[in-house]
Amino acid sequence: MTSNFSSTVAGLPRIGAKRELKFALEGYWNGSIEGRELAQTARQLVNTASDSLSGLDSVPFAGRSYYDAMLDTAAILGVLPERFDDIADHENDGLPLWIDRYFGAARGTETLPAQAMTKWFDTNYHYLVPELSADTRFVLDASALIEDLRCQQVRGVNARPVLVGPLTFLSLARTTDGSNPLDHLPALFEVYERLIKSFDTEWVQIDEPALVTDVAPEVLEQVRAGYTTLAKRDGVFVNTYFGSGDQALNTLAGIGLGAIGVDLVTHGVTELAAWKGEELLVAGIVDGRNIWRTDLCAALASLKRLAARGPIAVSTSCSLLHVPYTLEAENIEPEVRDWLAFGSEKITEVKLLADALAGNIDAAAFDAASAAIASRRTSPRTAPITQELPGRSRGSFDTRVTLQEKSLELPALPTTTIGSFPQTPSIRSARARLRKESITLEQYEEAMREEIDLVIAKQEELGLDVLVHGEPERNDMVQYFSELLDGFLSTANGWVQSYGSRCVRPPVLFGNVSRPAPMTVKWFQYAQSLTQKHVKGMLTGPVTILAWSFVRDDQPLATTADQVALALRDEINDLIEAGAKIIQVDEPAIRELLPLRDVDKPAYLQWSVDSFRLATAGAPDDVQIHTHMCYSEFNEVISSVIALDADVTTIEAARSDMQVLAALKSSGFELGVGPGVWDIHSPRVPSAQEVDGLLEAALQSVDPRQLWVNPDCGLKTRGWPEVEASLKVLVESAKQAREKIGATI
């Protein structure tokens, strides 16, 4: 019989407070460090993570993860993609034998494409999409995780292994033969029965965030049956997050599980009627996704009501993977700093609440939290704003097309890029020197102009039709704007993992948003002065700015989005006055904020479309508005993409084998569209045959008069040799396709 715990967190970040894993991975990939050093760095990081929870009585432990938990699970289950089977086992240097196949699946090789990558539920974290088929057979190998777990036990850590659950793993998988991944659910539960028995631990945590989504009743029956079998092992803890736990409790309560975890933040503390107190309720009352301080008094009151019904433990609403490590090194103005809690502060909040629930209240800490909550509520910087909004509509698309054809005079199948070009060491060095004040702002801006000179010249040499300035001045497509808008702040060390070795530093949107001055106009003007071709003005859209920031939670997202949209509308007007004929307003994140339950989706889609249109509707009809979208499974949102009313929509498509085309075709999409023909996330130059094939597939689904030719995403993370070689292939493919269709615009 297991003993209950009283305090924990749902999970921990893996990248390191100083991004140690990022730098070790990049060193291993470029050959500057050996595998043993990478393995040692990863071990040090998991030890440090476990030690950070020394005040809690149960520690989640996912082992040394080198890229992504879903990819870790695929490796444990023996279902890394078959195309990487010929990669030999790794030498015994502390890394798993399968690590080179694992990295091949994550990043691709010179000849093999990587697995698809998309967003983890409605977050800004990315996972690698498992590839299965009807013939998939699971071959269990948890030896690396078991070894890591034993190391923690030797260190005296009360660790519990954390696994991605069978339902979630299969719900997020894709098949290569059109079969249903969930057909494997009974077989996978049998594998998990063996897997959890292999752990010599009191508790085993199995994460099932898929249980907060819409799940078919017959699948829920299979899930209940599967977990009834797993519950024969003591100490099985099924954790859910990113939504209400009611469906999970309706499915799993009373079947003999040791614990069930629920998110009490995303939709608040719901009734949880199915919980009768038979199992430990792990109450996710501290927000694991956002960075606002917890109202400890309100949280304690909710916990006490639950504790009257049965045993509970205090936890975070989800893994702390999604928030920065600590406020400790941040130089943030005191008023706003008091409103915030990063990872280590949230761990402290969990401990404070657990102690208070046990009768040991830290009155000073609770008083400080209450004062911070009151300060935020009454600050003039967060006061509601009432204003009349301008219109959200432009002229008809037919009218706009006619005017834009005359204004732009582009060829059929026009070629362009998404916006950014390589952020070279010299660019990063100039930015770092500016931060350290070792160069002046004037010297920095001259270095950026020199980079724009290079980018424009190379694009003209390659023969691209519509150019970009390359965005050398932008550290990040959201952070750049947040640093120029009132109502935001930037952190110095607020890094979170986006995927693999890529980390981002989300800005904090803490108050009312406004634009004190133009943000991009001078860079556009300089770039346009260098060429006779059209240069796109480049902006990030309101939904993406919200999605990739930590956003205030004290007013509706729709209200905050409209504030950002109005600032962008002013910027668009200034770009047009400066001569811009094409303006791109990127919304790569528009799908990732889509609610997980169908009932909640219409309201989100309405306000997200409204905010984009509020930003862009001031543009004259002869100005072409572009937008760009990433990681987008378009079947669910295609009607909203149409409703955005952008003249051209470029879409990440190459990595998913042009799956977006079916949605475009079935919807009768009549606007301009550019499904990406080069997967920029894999470090390889696409072959002419590969790009030709993707472009041919696009032409079979899209009218040539609508079609643009472009990469999947921006080129910021790629190197110049790869970029030039790949764009050369892309431009040549477009030229040959033009000859075949014999069309001009």
Curated annotation (Swiss-Prot):
SUPFAM superfamilies: UROD/MetE-like
Residues given in the record as L-methionine binding sites: 418-420, 471, 586
Cofactor(s) of this protein: Zn(2+)
Catalytic activity as recorded in UniProt: 5-methyltetrahydropteroyltri-L-glutamate + L-homocysteine = tetrahydropteroyltri-L-glutamate + L-methionine
Residues bound to L-homocysteine: 418-420, 471, 586
Superkingdom field: Bacteria
Keywords assigned by UniProt, alphabetized: Amino-acid biosynthesis, Metal-binding, Methionine biosynthesis, Methyltransferase, Repeat, Transferase, Zinc
Transmembrane segments: none
One BP term from GO: methylation
Protein EC: 2.1.1.14
InterPro entries for this protein: Cbl-indep_Met_Synth_N (IPR013215), Cobalamin-indep_Met_synthase (IPR006276), Met_Synth_C/arc (IPR002629), UROD/MetE-like_sf (IPR038071)
Role of this protein: Catalyzes the transfer of a methyl group from 5-methyltetrahydrofolate to homocysteine resulting in methionine formation.
Full protein name: 5-methyltetrahydropteroyltriglutamate--homocysteine methyltransferase
Annotated source species: Corynebacterium glutamicum (strain ATCC 13032 / DSM 20300 / JCM 1318 / BCRC 11384 / CCUG 27702 / LMG 3730 / NBRC 12168 / NCIMB 10025 / NRRL B-2784 / 534)
Taxonomy of the source species: Bacteria, Bacillati, Actinomycetota, Actinomycetes, Mycobacteriales
Gene name linked to the record: metE
